[in-house]
Structures are given as C-alpha cells and as structure tokens.
C-alpha cells in the first residue's frame, strides 16, 4: 500500500516502505497544509523543473536538514549539489534506482530556468505513480502509458501555463490510466480549471476514470 498525500499545488508525498516528496513547494505555497519546519523530509525529493512554485529550494533545505536525495534533470541536480544537498542527476530515458525507489523521468511540454522540464514515473512497493509535472498534452503520453502502465496519474488541470480540463481529458485517454488526482489548479486566479470540468469532458469522451479530487492535506491509499 502506498499513501499519496496532496500538499497543495503540485506537491505530493508518497509513503510506503520509503518516503518520496514530489515538487515540494512548501514555503510560500498558499495551499500548503504544513510548514517546512513540520516536514519530516524524505528518502527522495523529485523536482520536475526549475520554477519557483515547484520546490527546488525547499527540496535542497529538506535534504540538507533530514537527508535524502534530490532527483531531477542533470542541470537542476547539479545546482542542488552546488548548494550542499545530496543529489542525483538524470535525463529522460529509463528506470534508475535511488535509495530504494525506482524512478524514470519522462517528457513534459513546459519551460524551466535550468535544464529541461520533465515528468516522472515513480515505482514504490509495486505501485507506479505518474506525476506529469507542468505540461501541455502531447501524443507521447500514449507511450508513457504503454511502457510504464501507471496505477495512478497526477495531472495538472489549471490551464494557462499547463493543461486545462479539456486537454487533461485527452491525456487520460492517451495514458489509459484509471485513477487520476488533479493538481496545479486554483492556486492562483489564472489556474481556473476544476475537477468537475474534467469529469464533464471525460463523460463527453466516453472515458471511464476515477477522478480523486483531494484537498490539501488529504490522502489516498493506492
């Protein structure tokens, strides 16, 4: 069993035999249910890209304070290492293992101050979770679904900078995933997308998928 806890915006904590924090933007996150001082850290911190709302600086602080490894595209991982954190750089390619957690970085359509933006598939205790990072929809999501068969997808739906509900509905179809937790919505006024709209678009497409809309601090057991 893997517990998936939503920490607001695009931040998630995966808990099983290991702890994984993804895009751990805590300080300054208006949706965060915790303060960084309350965070226990993790074995692995995955940072999908270098924008201020995705937690590179918080990942570095937590790694230095509690241990664990910052995992990201090579250039971001090097920045984390330069600032004193344990880090492991990678690129889009294949599964690698870090501190008992399997990770593969995946394509994402976005921008990044350092390196290229990515998503990630995380394998923990026999379960696979796909965090898309910040991205628009792209047809290669079908490859991600076929290769890695995620049990759960964490998808942005806010629009403007990322997919909106319409685009996310196509992403779900391409991935072939049956369980989805929406993210990256309603944090700021421009991120207007809502889970209800995603459900409507899925209905129009005839796609059956469980949309699990978590409030910050709530968890889902996979």
Curated annotation (Swiss-Prot):
GO molecular function: hydrolase activity
One Pfam assignment: Lactamase_B_2
Keywords: Hydrolase
Keyword Iron annotated: no
Family: Belongs to the UPF0173 family.
Annotated PANTHER family: UPF0173 METAL-DEPENDENT HYDROLASE MJ1163, UPF0173 METAL-DEPENDENT HYDROLASE MJ1163-RELATED
Descriptive protein name: UPF0173 metal-dependent hydrolase Kcr_0055
